Amino acid sequence: MILKKYEALPENMKNNEVKEYYEILKHKKFSLIIKRVFDFFAALILLIILSPIMLILAIMIKLESKGPVFYRQERITKYGKKFRIFKFRTMVQDADKKGALVTMGQDPRITKVGNRIRKCRLDELPQLLNVIKGEMSFVGTRPEVEKYVKEYSNEMKATLLMPAGISSRASIEYRDEDEIIN
Protein backbone atom coordinates (compact mmCIF):
# COMPACT_ATOMS: atom_id res chain seq x y z
CA MET A 1 0.00 0.00 0.00
CA ILE A 2 2.12 2.83 -1.29
CA LEU A 3 1.07 6.36 -0.44
CA LYS A 4 0.79 8.68 -3.45
CA LYS A 5 2.61 11.98 -3.39
CA TYR A 6 0.39 14.73 -2.03
CA GLU A 7 0.48 16.51 -5.39
CA ALA A 8 -0.90 13.36 -7.08
CA LEU A 9 -4.00 13.19 -4.86
CA PRO A 10 -7.38 13.93 -6.46
CA GLU A 11 -8.08 17.68 -6.44
CA ASN A 12 -10.99 17.37 -4.01
CA MET A 13 -8.62 15.81 -1.43
CA LYS A 14 -6.03 18.58 -1.55
CA ASN A 15 -6.95 20.62 1.51
CA ASN A 16 -5.42 21.46 4.89
CA GLU A 17 -7.43 18.86 6.79
CA VAL A 18 -6.33 16.00 4.51
CA LYS A 19 -2.75 17.29 4.44
CA GLU A 20 -2.56 17.04 8.24
CA TYR A 21 -3.38 13.30 8.10
CA TYR A 22 -1.24 12.81 5.00
CA GLU A 23 1.81 14.13 6.85
CA ILE A 24 1.30 11.52 9.57
CA LEU A 25 0.85 8.68 7.09
CA LYS A 26 3.86 9.55 4.96
CA HIS A 27 6.09 8.72 7.94
CA LYS A 28 4.50 5.27 8.17
CA LYS A 29 5.22 3.97 4.67
CA PHE A 30 6.88 0.77 5.92
CA SER A 31 3.91 0.03 8.20
CA LEU A 32 1.53 0.57 5.29
CA ILE A 33 3.48 -1.91 3.15
CA ILE A 34 3.44 -4.48 5.98
CA LYS A 35 -0.31 -3.92 6.41
CA ARG A 36 -0.93 -4.55 2.71
CA VAL A 37 1.20 -7.72 2.69
CA PHE A 38 -0.63 -8.98 5.79
CA ASP A 39 -4.04 -8.15 4.28
CA PHE A 40 -3.20 -9.99 1.05
CA PHE A 41 -1.88 -13.20 2.59
CA ALA A 42 -4.42 -13.34 5.43
CA ALA A 43 -7.29 -12.85 2.95
CA LEU A 44 -5.88 -15.50 0.63
CA ILE A 45 -5.47 -18.03 3.45
CA LEU A 46 -8.93 -17.29 4.85
CA LEU A 47 -10.49 -17.57 1.40
CA ILE A 48 -8.95 -21.02 0.97
CA ILE A 49 -9.95 -22.19 4.46
CA LEU A 50 -13.47 -20.74 4.31
CA SER A 51 -14.27 -21.74 0.71
CA PRO A 52 -16.27 -24.85 1.77
CA ILE A 53 -18.44 -22.70 4.06
CA MET A 54 -18.81 -20.11 1.31
CA LEU A 55 -19.90 -22.83 -1.13
CA ILE A 56 -22.56 -24.04 1.33
CA LEU A 57 -23.82 -20.48 1.81
CA ALA A 58 -23.97 -19.97 -1.96
CA ILE A 59 -26.04 -23.14 -2.38
CA MET A 60 -28.40 -22.10 0.44
CA ILE A 61 -28.92 -18.66 -1.13
CA LYS A 62 -29.56 -20.16 -4.56
CA LEU A 63 -32.02 -22.75 -3.23
CA GLU A 64 -34.06 -20.19 -1.30
CA SER A 65 -34.56 -17.44 -3.85
CA LYS A 66 -34.09 -16.38 -7.45
CA GLY A 67 -31.22 -14.17 -8.40
CA PRO A 68 -27.46 -14.09 -8.11
CA VAL A 69 -25.56 -15.46 -5.13
CA PHE A 70 -23.54 -12.28 -4.78
CA TYR A 71 -24.67 -8.73 -4.25
CA ARG A 72 -22.39 -6.25 -5.98
CA GLN A 73 -22.52 -2.52 -5.58
CA GLU A 74 -20.27 0.35 -6.55
CA ARG A 75 -18.52 1.86 -3.54
CA ILE A 76 -15.67 4.29 -2.92
CA THR A 77 -12.24 3.38 -1.55
CA LYS A 78 -8.72 4.84 -1.38
CA TYR A 79 -8.25 8.16 -3.22
CA GLY A 80 -11.95 8.23 -4.10
CA LYS A 81 -11.56 5.32 -6.52
CA LYS A 82 -14.73 3.40 -7.39
CA PHE A 83 -14.85 -0.37 -6.96
CA ARG A 84 -17.45 -3.11 -6.83
CA ILE A 85 -17.95 -4.56 -3.37
CA PHE A 86 -18.90 -8.23 -3.08
CA LYS A 87 -21.28 -9.61 -0.47
CA PHE A 88 -23.50 -12.65 -0.25
CA ARG A 89 -26.99 -11.61 -1.29
CA THR A 90 -29.22 -11.59 1.79
CA MET A 91 -32.27 -9.89 0.29
CA VAL A 92 -34.73 -10.64 -2.46
CA GLN A 93 -33.57 -9.92 -5.99
CA ASP A 94 -33.63 -6.19 -6.91
CA ALA A 95 -34.24 -5.21 -3.27
CA ASP A 96 -32.52 -1.85 -3.85
CA LYS A 97 -35.34 -0.97 -6.28
CA LYS A 98 -37.99 -1.96 -3.73
CA GLY A 99 -36.96 0.11 -0.74
CA ALA A 100 -34.43 2.30 1.04
CA LEU A 101 -30.64 2.08 0.65
CA VAL A 102 -30.25 1.50 4.39
CA THR A 103 -31.65 -1.71 5.86
CA MET A 104 -33.04 -1.53 9.38
CA GLY A 105 -34.87 -3.86 11.71
CA GLN A 106 -37.12 -6.54 10.28
CA ASP A 107 -36.90 -5.43 6.66
CA PRO A 108 -39.29 -7.67 4.66
CA ARG A 109 -36.80 -7.75 1.77
CA ILE A 110 -34.37 -9.87 3.83
CA THR A 111 -34.68 -13.58 3.07
CA LYS A 112 -34.78 -16.24 5.82
CA VAL A 113 -31.33 -17.53 4.87
CA GLY A 114 -30.16 -13.94 4.51
CA ASN A 115 -31.29 -13.14 8.04
CA ARG A 116 -29.19 -15.98 9.47
CA ILE A 117 -26.21 -15.04 7.31
CA ARG A 118 -26.43 -11.41 8.47
CA LYS A 119 -26.65 -12.32 12.15
CA CYS A 120 -23.32 -14.14 11.86
CA ARG A 121 -21.89 -11.45 9.54
CA LEU A 122 -21.10 -14.14 6.97
CA ASP A 123 -22.44 -11.93 4.17
CA GLU A 124 -19.11 -10.09 4.37
CA LEU A 125 -16.94 -13.13 3.48
CA PRO A 126 -16.82 -12.39 -0.28
CA GLN A 127 -15.10 -9.11 0.59
CA LEU A 128 -11.96 -11.19 1.05
CA LEU A 129 -11.78 -10.94 -2.76
CA ASN A 130 -11.82 -7.15 -2.48
CA VAL A 131 -8.98 -7.35 0.06
CA ILE A 132 -6.90 -9.57 -2.23
CA LYS A 133 -7.46 -7.10 -5.09
CA GLY A 134 -6.25 -4.25 -2.86
CA GLU A 135 -9.59 -2.42 -2.97
CA MET A 136 -10.24 -3.03 0.72
CA SER A 137 -8.39 -3.83 3.91
CA PHE A 138 -9.42 -5.86 6.95
CA VAL A 139 -9.62 -2.66 9.00
CA GLY A 140 -10.52 0.69 7.49
CA THR A 141 -13.38 3.11 7.11
CA ARG A 142 -16.78 2.03 5.89
CA PRO A 143 -16.91 1.63 2.10
CA GLU A 144 -19.58 4.18 1.20
CA VAL A 145 -21.62 4.77 -1.93
CA GLU A 146 -20.60 7.78 -4.02
CA LYS A 147 -23.77 9.69 -3.06
CA TYR A 148 -22.58 9.87 0.57
CA VAL A 149 -18.90 10.49 -0.22
CA LYS A 150 -19.87 13.58 -2.23
CA GLU A 151 -21.22 15.03 1.05
CA TYR A 152 -17.94 14.49 2.97
CA SER A 153 -16.44 17.45 4.77
CA ASN A 154 -12.79 18.26 4.06
CA GLU A 155 -11.74 16.39 7.19
CA MET A 156 -13.80 13.32 6.28
CA LYS A 157 -12.00 13.17 2.93
CA ALA A 158 -8.86 12.20 4.87
CA THR A 159 -10.43 8.75 5.32
CA LEU A 160 -9.91 8.29 1.58
CA LEU A 161 -6.14 8.19 2.11
CA MET A 162 -6.59 4.55 3.12
CA PRO A 163 -8.56 1.68 1.60
CA ALA A 164 -12.06 0.99 2.87
CA GLY A 165 -12.29 -1.81 5.41
CA ILE A 166 -14.31 -4.95 6.02
CA SER A 167 -14.40 -3.86 9.66
CA SER A 168 -13.80 -0.64 11.52
CA ARG A 169 -13.85 0.69 15.03
CA ALA A 170 -17.36 2.03 14.44
CA SER A 171 -18.69 -1.30 13.14
CA ILE A 172 -17.35 -3.01 16.26
CA GLU A 173 -18.64 -0.38 18.71
CA TYR A 174 -22.03 -0.09 16.96
CA ARG A 175 -22.51 -3.72 15.97
CA ASP A 176 -26.30 -3.52 16.29
CA GLU A 177 -26.68 -0.29 14.33
CA ASP A 178 -30.36 -0.83 13.50
CA GLU A 179 -31.21 -1.25 17.20
CA ILE A 180 -29.51 2.07 17.99
CA ILE A 181 -31.29 3.87 15.13
CA ASN A 182 -34.73 2.48 15.99
Whereabouts are the PLM-identified features?
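Short, conserved beta-strand/loop elements in beta-sheet-dominated catalytic cores
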Residues: 115-134
